[in-house]
Curated annotation (Swiss-Prot):
It comes from Caenorhabditis elegans. Residues 36-105 form the J domain. Residues 293-323 form a coiled coil. Pfam families: DnaJ (PF00226). The chain crosses the membrane at residues 4-24, 127-147, 222-242. InterPro entries: DnaJ_domain, DnaJ_domain_CS, DNAJC25-like, J_dom_sf. It comes from the Eukaryota. PROSITE patterns: DNAJ_1, DNAJ_2. It is found in: Membrane. Belongs to the DNAJC25 family. This is DnaJ homolog dnj-2. It is a multi-pass membrane protein. The keyword Signal does not apply.
């Protein structure tokens, strides 16, 4: 009697255990469901070869293709089988997917990790990250180039309308025989010659536009700086090592280039900004006051800033600007006052 009761209980326990093992080993919604993808394609995991994989897939795809079945119910079964075969092939032909699947087979207990890897790979875009990076750099570089071109055109249009630059261009054009004056002192309108375009081209050739409105160049784009980045790093390391060797170890005295570097560093400007902003007289003053020493440079900079503030405060234009800003206005780049 006791054995008759124990047998059904044992059967239920074993059945429950088998179901639990199945649920831990394979998840219906992952990969090939409750089947092993290797078994689906009839390939040996230990002797895996992509050429054999492709061959096995083509053979099974032909055998189980839904178009070969006419019966409606059998066609549905064939479609389901064909889907499993295709899923198995897509899983094993991709290196990353195969690695994740092998881990899934070897570590069935790590359910959450296996789910994450499966859906992460499915959700990830099938695009080479290198292509995305290169494409992004090129788009940014194109935008930089076109923006610089537009700003340079704005600067030239502005300069063309300024009397001083226009008169200088007209004089230069007359000297070169590109423009002619009539008896009344006005420019002749020769056939086939656009005087305004000639003047504009002369201004472009002779005007030195710097800063944010300088002429566009590929050498100012992100793409170019990315290309020369290794060389830039090498030069920086070489320069730093040489500086340390000369002035920290050898205790050499600073030459003029080293002094100028320290001055720019303490003022807080780049070499291009320094060349644009400071005259030869300013540089002589900086050297005379030994501004390569940090404390001297700080004193000089404070005096310079105070003098500029006072000069601006006394300027009628600056006062108009302050009143304008007080009234919540904005100021444009071009101001001909």
């Amino acid at each position: 009697m006791r054995s008759a009761i124990a047998a059904p209980i044992l059967f239920l326990l074993v059945s429950f255990f088998v179901q639990e093992c199945e649920s831990v080993g394979f998840a219906p919604e992952l990969y090939c469901g409750l089947e092993n993808c290797y078994d689906v394609l009839e390939v040996n995991r230990e002797e895996f070869d992509k050429q054999k994989l492709a061959k096995a897939y083509r053979a099974l795809a032909r055998k189980h293709h839904p178009d070969r079945v006419k019966n409606k119910e059998e066609k549905l079964l064939a479609e389901e089988r064909f889907r499993v075969i295709a899923t198995a092939y897509e899983t094993l032909k991709d290196d990353e997917a195969k690695t994740n699947y092998d881990y899934y087979l070897d570590h069935p207990d790590q359910r959450f990790y296996n789910y994450y890897q499966y859906y992460r790979l499915r959700a990830a875009p099938k695009v080479d990250l290198r292509i995305v990076i290169v494409g992004t750099i090129l788009i940014i570089s194109l935008f930089q180039f076109l923006s610089a071109k537009h700003k340079f055109s704005e600067a030239i249009e502005y300069a063309t309308g300024v009397g001083k630059f226009r008169n200088m261009a007209i004089k230069d054009g007359i000297d070169k025989g590109l423009l002619e004056m009539d008896r009344n002192g006005k420019l002749k309108k020769n056939k086939g010659v656009d005087n305004d375009e000639v003047i504009k081209q002369i201004i472009i050739d002779n005007l030195d536009v710097t800063g944010g409105y300088k002429r566009e160049s590929i050498y100012d784009t992100l793409a170019w700086h990315t290309i020369i980045f290794p060389l830039t790093i090498f030069r920086y390391i070489k320069w730093t090592a040489l500086w340390y060797w000369r002035f920290a170890i050898q205790k050499e005295e600073y030459d003029d280039d080293a002094k100028l570097y320290l001055i720019r560093k303490y003022i807080g400007v780049s070499q291009m900004e320094f060349d644009q902003k400071y005259t030869d007289e300013d540089i002589d003053d900086l050297f005379e006051r030994e501004c390569w020493l940090k404390r001297n440079c700080a004193t000089w900079k404070a005096e310079r800033d105070a003098a500029e503030q006072e000069k601006m405060a006394q300027s009628g234009r600056y006062k108009r600007y302050k009143r304008y800003m007080k009234n919540a206005g904005t100021i444009s780049f071009v101001d001909e006052d």
